[in-house]
């Protein structure tokens, strides 16, 4: 499939079934109006040590046997609801092999195993992380941050995410683009009445990921927060660029 194009302007009016449009793994679930990535108790409070993923049920082609590589654009709105201090650990938009599974909770964001998280030879995933916890062991900067991860929890690029945005329980809009010609992955994060954040990095997705991937959202909780995806648009096309 050369082109993938879908839009969920909200999650109120769609009767999503697990595995038909959106696949839920781990603790992720559908609630009225949102995809909830991590667990809450009967009172709606966050459950610690939780991890979950919500992904598009059809695979996305990143490249083909003729040498074409795909460009893509995705936008989504999310709410990272903070229930007090401390709060951890954040969420990520990811691309991974279609048979990949949800991994460890906390700072691993459901994308990595703790034994191999920092070893690029043991992982196959590219992610844009929105990280609310400082993990010094992984060379995190000393503040909440947006990062680009390539086969490792140790980000190849980061930018500061100001505390009042990261912990403010405000709806954020993310735009992520990948240009197959320049091989530049870019993320723009914005708030309606606040700041904009931008981060870019060169990564050749055709060299680090398989031909077909699973795309979606992953989150891990160490402390008191819950992640909700409120809308999602995605478009990709094999545009003829030689990979």
From Swiss-Prot:
Glycoprotein keyword on record: yes
Residues spanning the signal sequence: none
Similarity comment: family membership: Belongs to the leguminous lectin family.
PTM annotation: N-glycosylation of Asn-5 converts form Beta to form Alpha.
Protein name per the record: Lectin-4
Quaternary assembly: Homodimer of Alpha and Beta forms.
Keyword Metal-binding on entry: yes
Coiled coil: none
Functional note: Lectin which has a strong affinity for both the Lewis b and y human blood-group determinants.
Residue positions the entry lists as glycosylated: 5, 18
Extra remark beyond the main annotation: Binds one manganese (or another transition metal) ion and one calcium ion. The metal ions are essential for the saccharide-binding and cell-agglutinating activities.
GO MF annotations in UniProt: carbohydrate binding; metal ion binding
Residue positions binding Mn(2+): 129, 131, 140, 145
Entry-linked InterPro entries: ConA-like_dom_sf (IPR013320), L-lectin (IPR016363), Lectin_LegA_CS (IPR000985), Lectin_legB_Mn/Ca_BS (IPR019825), Legume_lectin_dom (IPR001220), Leguminous_Lectin (IPR050258)
Species per Swiss-Prot/TrEMBL record: Griffonia simplicifolia (Bandeiraea simplicifolia)
Keywords in alphabetical order: Calcium, Glycoprotein, Lectin, Manganese, Metal-binding, Pyrrolidone carboxylic acid
In-chain residues carrying the UniProt-annotated modification Pyrrolidone carboxylic acid: 1
UniProt: Ca(2+) binding residues: 131, 133, 135, 140
